[in-house]
Amino acid sequence: MLSCNSANADYLFHKERASYDGSLDVGDKTLQCGRVIDIMKLWTYFKGNGWKQIAEQVENEHKLALYVKDYVIAHPDRYELVVPEVDTFNVCFWYKPVEMDRKNYKSEEEYLQLLSKVTVLAKKYMIDEGKLLVGYSSSKSPYYFWRTVTSNPYNTNEDMDFKMKLIGEYCEQAFKELMTK
């Protein structure tokens, strides 16, 4: 079943899972995750909603992604865009902990390696606490960053503010733990 349905989407279902129980990522083992079922989901959604409502929802999701991008830009001391242009529902960024000053690291590589560790550990805190679930990615680079996707038609700007604030809290907690090791 896994070999038939798996998309092997490393950007969604992280293979390393060093910091949390990988059995929670069951999506790659299900029929619903495969591309085969996507057209059926789209057709059913279209029949129930029509083009106008779908267009409004897509536009709203894109506006929310742009809102997150603007949030990151408005807080350059804490956030940094990885991909400056947002033309989808994905926003890729790093959270920079308060006490983590780029000038204190010998190289950019050392700095980004620590940001990656902070991201992965913060994801563990998210899963353990269960308040929020945001993915991270590496986009074929050795460094992990946050990859948030706006895909809930009921989300608001306030929900995005909450998400970004919580990401910051988890990252601050992760940084402190990493510095005490």
Q: Which residues does each PLM region occupy?
A:
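Surface-exposed helix-capping loop/turn segments at secondary-structure junctions
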Residues: V72-V82, K176-K181
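PLP-dependent enzyme catalytic core of the Aspartate aminotransferase-like
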Residues: Y105-E108, S138-K181
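Short beta-strand
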Residues: E80-V86, V134-S139, K181
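Generic recognition of stable, solvent-exposed alpha-helical segments in well-folded globular domains
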Residues: I37, E56-K63, Y67, V86, ...
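Active-site C-terminal subdomain of aminotransferase-like
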Residues: M1-H75
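Conserved PLP-binding catalytic core of the aspartate aminotransferase-like
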Residues: L81-M126
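Short, hydrophobic beta-strand segments
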Residues: T44-Y45, C92-Y95, W146-S151
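A generic structural motif
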Residues: G48-K52, E99, N152-N157
